[in-house]
Amino acid sequence: MFNSNCRNKIFCILIFFSLAFFTENAVCEQPKKRDYWPTGDWKASAPEQQGMDSAKLLIADEFIQNRLPDAFSLLVVRNGYLVFEKYYSWGSPEKIAVVHSVTKSVTSALIGIALDKGYLDSVDQKLIDFFPEYASGDLDPRIKEINLKHILTMSAGFRWNDRGPVMRDWYTSEDWAKFTIQLPLVTMPGDKFNYNSSISHLLSIILAKSTKTSTLDFAKQNLFEPLGIQSGFWRQDPQGYQIGGFGLGFSARDLAKFGFLYLNNGYWNGQSIVPEQWVKQSTEQQIQAVRHPFYGTFGYGYQWWVKQVDGCSSFRAWGRRGQYIVVVPELDLVIAVTSNPGLPHPPTSIHYSPLFDLVAASVKRKRPPKSPLTAVELPADVKAFILDYDQARFNKDVVKMAELISDQFIYNGVTKQMAVEFLSRNLPYMSEAKIIITKYEQEGNEVKIDVWLKDKYFEAPFMTGSKLIKENDHWKWFGNQVPNSP
């Protein structure tokens, strides 16, 4: 096992090897039978004994130190054994981390357990049936059509922004459930994904009402204690309900246990903890979620994110400020990450994705050769524009970047102002990566391009399918004019 003293281990002197990233055709494996269960604690194993490459794991370690300064821990479990465990900054095995929205995935598991035990009937049950006190005559009739599945898939349709003033108003209100249910509806239930922590909280209230116990007590009896999870805390709302969308405290090892439960389809030491069918439904895409210019499309299940990792199907619990459980069933792999929960939201948050590809790439398996990125030839004026833009990006020159981006810019819902703010942050992975144009099509004053970023750790599409447009004889970045999911 790697730990904080791993540099004293013999296998730590192995030489770094190059990695292949974003390989869609990588050969994946199936989970194996377990010869022990980590109810008490994890058993350690050298990476090579579990079919992993120590040197490549060390590249993941280097990536954290060079790219993710807020990280507290990285744990890697392969074949049920802890093959890598390292703590950074203030992290430690005993530290209970605020895991933010990883809480949502735990709440989802509890909903599945409650359904299995008969406390709930089905995901088709209407939200308002659990809150009849708010079913007044002037309530939008569409709200009465919202069911549990809409809540689980973030498609209830309420007007909401998790980082906007509505979140603050909800958080400071006296009755969180009432505030949420009386929000205006902007889309029909089930039509569109919109990330919303307030509706995840409703799931916790529904659990407490249905089971006639607190969400925490229900979790301890039916989930935490069978797995040997020692939860540190679970914050409450003003009415005393555990917060369904955030506020849970877990150690990194306990995060890995929860991921291991889902890796094993809800079974633990021969006992079904979370129904297998619920695990399957929760971790497969129920709705398209986020389209990100750097990492492509994320799907969403029942409070779980769905995204490939190094070419293999995968799902993840994702908490703000760098809290993750990533499960890759085809590689028999669980990755747990905790980070400083108290810092301002780091611009590196979504940049944890290459870390998971790095870890998965350390699993020894047959892999087809990776085709190198090939840059296309560009006309002199377009090439000059790209070079100017690249230099402004590297220098974080906000004024210059604003000059080079059209006022009409929109890329998957990202406006010019948002793009400039994002690009001007202290993002080493953005400023140090090389831009490679792999596709170029010009028609009049418009140019369609595919752009990739490449550095020593990764290569990834960036603003792919974007356009340049000539305005007053000057090329400017135009985006793609396609609205995105929130």
Description of each model-found segment:
Residues Q230-S231, K280-V334:
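Active-site Gly/Thr loop motif
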Residues D61-G91, I325-V326, D332-A336:
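A short, well-structured edge-of-sheet supersecondary motif
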Residues V420-G465:
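Surface-exposed, charged secondary-structure patches
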